[in-house]
Amino acid sequence: AEYAMRNYDKAIMYEPLSESLAQLRELFLYRQMVVRHRCSFQVRRGEKKLTMEKSPIKTMISQSGRHIVSELNKEVEKIDKRIAELIKSDEELTEVFTIVTSVPGIGTQNAVCLMVYTDNFRRFNYDSRKIACYYGLAPFGKDSGTSVHSDPHVHYMANRQIKAMLTQAALAAVKFNP
């Protein structure tokens, strides 16, 4: 209690996500799950085509898999439309989304991912070092005196999903916007 009283002025009060950002987060995570399932069905269909000989069972499995993949594609499209509607309905989300997508290589999914995981860029108080560490973009080495040195590497607790999305965005920007 004494510690809390002494450091009360330094305390950062918790602020829950806004309603629209919480909904955006749920939609984004649901979309990721659907895309993962779609990918797994596509891989399984490809494996079945290679391993099974022509038979009525193979035909049935292939048709069923194709139907499931098409339904999952429709679901992803519905989610994408809902995400776009949600962003347009909130003024703050629209403003941030417009700014983020103005960066070459950053698309809708990259922008939504960044907005969701950084609480619409308010989570780190605009500190670039903290943001780079969280994204997994800032490698750090260990040095101690003259004998202990390690190569710089990214911490294992960095957000790998954001790092992967930003890497893909950078590759796309280099490829299409030299």
What are the language-model segments listed below?
Residues S102, T108, V112-P178:
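Phosphate-backbone recognition surface of nucleic-acid-processing proteins
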Residues A1-I99:
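Long, charge-rich intrinsically disordered scaffolds of nucleic-acid metabolism proteins
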